[in-house]
A protein has these predicted regions:
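NAD(P)-dinucleotide binding in Rossmann-like oxidoreductases
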Residues: 1-47, 55-64
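C-terminal helix-rich "cap/oligomerization" subdomain common to oxidoreductases
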Residues: 47-106
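N-terminal binding-site loop/beta-alpha segment at the start of enzyme catalytic domains
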Residues: 91-178, 209, 237
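Active-site mouth loops of central-metabolism enzymes
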Residues: 122-134, 183-194, 217-222
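Short, acidic/polar
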Residues: 130-142, 190-206, 255-260
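A short, structured active-site edge motif that brings together acidic residues
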Residues: 176-187, 272-277
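Active-site groove signature of glycoside hydrolases
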Residues: 204-224
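Beta/alpha (TIM)-barrel catalytic core signal, keyed to glycine-rich beta->alpha loops juxtaposed to Asp/Glu
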Residues: 219-410
Length: 410
């Protein structure tokens, strides 16, 4: 037993005690020490650093154990509504004092039609940050690594995600340096007048004067495409949308119909398709009304038309993680992806990852951003560690032959 297991004692050497109970008899073994528990921890860290290791050897606590403890503590705090003073919005400052892109930032960039700003090839999905302190830490780190693009929607968290992201952008004073996709018109509000209403509410939540990119989150087949094109162009004419329009979970046929109408009437059409595209074929819709563009026909159309793809669930929600990590997410998480052809793709990703010195999930993300058309991948890290392990995909260069082989198109 240890007198105080929670805080390493820096003042006195706590004596250890082992209590052994056998056949109803108790034996007490006192373990004398002249060192404080803090000294033991410091020595263990020093030994690990000297050996070039990233964590101390047993019995030191492993990183996974530490993170598990912190995750549990966070869940307890959420349950009782505890927020520390340092986590208050006005106290959540950048770790280095001022927010800036690091000199060694690994991010790469692409171009989206209608935007003067470069757009990071990986885009931060903003649909899971529940408190400002968490969001600010994630987004500060993202920006420092070179990430300048964010994806959010009117429907996420009942508006909470837009509010938190907007507060962070305002606090950091970086509105002109970031690209934020505003999405709306999600079912059942996929009607022209409600699109406009929700768009204005999104800008109000975000505290923005304009949207960089506007994407319709769903389509409504009962509404002629021209009605959507008309209201979107009214927003553009008021300088409320300064870049591209697009559709999420839209069929190619309806997407083309939008552009035919826009061309015939001298208006701006769609240039961004925001469907799922990943190395794993979407076997079942992740959510109702979801559409993928992973199939060969859709990818050929994207290439032939030069349409920009901004892919959601670009890493198939962890399908390419090692089995141990994959199972932590729960088997139900992969019902939308698991199939013999996708297992074969995962096997090929694992094989290629070994050759290229990266992870299979890096191969999965690289597959998306190495397509022969403008292609961006939305990722949804829940922790800074997940961001860090996703970014090596940027350095993975795939040939056209490797892209085809990964999908199974030899």
């Amino acid at each position: 037993t240890v007198a105080n297991p929670w805080v390493a004692n820096r003042q006195t050497a706590d004596q250890g005690r082992v209590v052994v109970t056998a056949k109803g008899e108790e034996q007490i073994i006192d373990v004398e020490t002249k060192c404080t528990s803090f000294a033991y921890e410091a020595d263990r860290v020093a030994a690990a650093v000297a050996a070039g290791e990233v964590e101390g050897a047993w019995p030191a606590m492993a990183w996974d154990d530490t993170m598990g403890n912190l995750t549990t503590l966070d869940s307890w705090r959420r349950a009782i509504g505890l927020t520390y003073d340092l986590e208050l919005e006005e106290e959540c400052k950048p770790l280095r004092g001022t927010l800036a892109k690091r000199d060694d930032a690994p991010m790469k960039y692409g171009k989206v039609e209608g935007l003067d700003k470069p757009v990071s090839k990986l885009i931060m999905g903003c649909d899971n940050q529940q408190i400002y302190a968490h969001g600010a830490a994630m987004w500060d780190d993202w920006y420092e690594r070179g990430g300048n693009a964010f994806d959010t929607s009117w429907v996420y968290g009942g508006g909470k995600m837009e509010i938190l992201l907007g507060k962070w952008v305002k606090a950091r004073d970086i509105r002109e340096q970031v690209v934020v996709t505003v999405k709306g018109a999600h079912s059942p509000r996929c009607l022209p007048d409600l699109l406009v209403q929700d768009f204005h509410e999104s800008l109000e939540r975000l505290q923005f004067d304009y949207a960089d990119i506007y994407i319709m989150h769903r389509d409504n087949l009962e509404v002629p495409v021209g009605e959507f094109v008309d209201v979107l162009n009214e927003l553009k004419d008021k300088d409320l949308v300064r870049g591209a329009f697009g559709g999420s979970n839209w069929t190619i046929e309806r997407f083309e119909a939008v552009n035919e109408y826009a061309s015939a009437h001298g208006k701006q059409g769609f240039s961004v398709l925001n469907n799922n595209l990943s190395l794993a074929r979407m076997v079942e819709p992740v959510w109702g009304g979801c559409i993928h563009a992973s199939d060969r026909v859709s990818r050929q159309w994207l290439e032939e038309t030069g349409t920009t793809s901004i892919a959601w669930s670009s890493q198939a929600r962890g399908y390419f993680l090692p089995e141990g990590e994959r199972m932590k997410l729960g088997a139900d998480n992969f019902a939308c992806w698991d199939a013999p052809d996708n297992r074969a793709r995962r096997d090929r990703a694992e094989e290629l990852a070994e050759k290229k010195g990266c992870t299979p999930i890096n191969i999965a993300a690289a597959y998306v951003i190495n397509q022969p058309f403008p292609s961006f991948a939305i990722i949804g890290p829940r922790a800074i560690q997940e961001t860090a392990t996703s970014l090596p995909a940027l350095d993975v260069e795939l040939t056209a032959e490797e892209v085809a082989w990964l999908w199974g198109e030899e």
